[in-house]
Amino acid sequence: MLVLEQTKELALKLRDPDKVTEMVSGSRVTAKGATIVPHTVDAVHKLRGIGINAPSPILHHYGWPSKYTPYNHQRLTAAFLTVNPKALVLNEIGTGKTQSALWAADYLISVGEVSKVLIISPLSTLERVWGDAIREGTNNRQPVILTGT
């Protein structure tokens, strides 16, 4: 598998390209036999559903907006979150789970996969941890904090 970063596509060498071209819209087979697939979250979900372990597009097509440079484990956590709709992050304390989740959410919003994100948190961490992280860790996102019982 080859990631074509310029065109935001994946090049695959498959025994049965018809299975992929029928399932993933915008995919095609080249004259040399490579199957070209759009490198999108939706396409990755479909490919993984048939056993092709395609990488998350966030790893190749995201600018990581933040005053912080992400560590590799934070990139991998954000990638995991973008391709696993039901996920639980159990990384150690202080490893950047909050920022990884925000990068994943920011990416999914920027590519139109989701429109809003709901964060439920104890009041003690809502403003100072999540609010600050959203303001500092994304270029154009603003939190709206609601409290109540």
Feature map (PLM): residue ranges:
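Interdomain "pre-motor" coupling segment immediately N-terminal to P-loop NTPase/helicase cores
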Residues: 4-54
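SF2 helicase/translocase NTPase motor core
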Residues: 15, 19-30, 52-79, 83-86, ...
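The Walker A (P-loop) glycine that initiates the GxxxxGKT/S ATP-binding motif of P-loop NTPases
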Residues: 91
